[in-house]
Amino acid sequence: MSDYQLAQLPWLADAHQRFVDVHYRGKNSHAHLLNVDNALGGVVLANACAETVLCQQLTPVGACGQCKSCLLLSANNHPDLHVVKPDGNQIKVDQIRLLCQSLTQTAQQGGARVALITDVERLNIAAANALLKTLEEPGNDVVLILQTNHTSQLLPTITSRCHTLAFNAPDKQQIQQWLAQQHLLPAPNEQGKTHDVTWCLSVVGGPLSLAESLRSKHYQQLLTYRQDWAQSLQSGHLTNSLLTLTEQQIVDALNVLYLYLRQYVLKSNSKMQLQGKPALQLNPLVQGKLIEFAGTVMQMCQKLQTMPSVNTQALCQQYILTFKQLTNG
């Protein structure tokens, strides 16, 4: 996902320009927090912000791309850019200590020293505490750029010491249009209608990961799960792909079930159709029970991240029986 360039991700343009405007006017903060998920291009935006800070001939629209600093960045060889990424599932205290030590050294290119930390929510407690001192007293010409996927997982003492860059995520229509420009959408049907692929955004994570899914067989697998859940919930018996789910596939399949249940409730009192069939009219009590059931499915998705093993077929059959009982099917 990091292979994209800033210009290829139009929803990042406004946030990037806001960062450039502040820095161009010389009012740059010493610490910036970018609450932009990797699946939206968070690392791409973070790199562009680092380029803005380090560029020696900054233009009103961003880094010049031609100065010595920009050329070093292009070659991934800038001595004053210090990047920290998770080591496994965590950012560890030794990584932050080494970073803080590097930031005390004189800038080799005579400008700023920039620390770029991606997935900063993965700081363990010791690493977060080690970073706090640098956030409080960063030193002259030190700029920290922190990219996160989940600000809620950060210590308040970290977020309060950073300037959060405003960012507006793209809506589904913008994402669909972007995917069309990438020539990734399935061919229109016989009526000329384009298939809406954004239904699974919450499963894959965002537009960049959805693009990867469309390039591979992953998206088609998600679509198959949705079709097979619809058939299985109607018949009361597992069918097709749900009979042979592996432990690696079950989380995706249950995430799709969660989305299907929510869609079922949303459309139950409308004249719209679900999977080509008229939606049932459900009373509010049944709707509430189905919403609660969907929540149970989502909780299981989270538990499965750490469970050593699970009987996927039995679990799916249990959910089908629960659905039939709730809907008196």
For the regions a protein language model found, what residue spans apply to each?
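Clamp-loader machinery-focused feature within the broader ASCE/P-loop NTPase space
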Residues: 1-126
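Conserved catalytic/switch belt of AAA+ P-loop NTPases
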Residues: 104, 129-146
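Charged, glycine-rich active-site and insertion segments that engage polyanionic ligands
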Residues: 1-52, 69-72, 140-142, 149-329
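Conserved adenine-binding aromatic site and its adjacent loop/helix in ATP-hydrolyzing domains
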Residues: 101, 133, 160
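Catalytic acidic motif of RecA-like/P-loop NTPases
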Residues: 118-124, 129-132, 136, 152
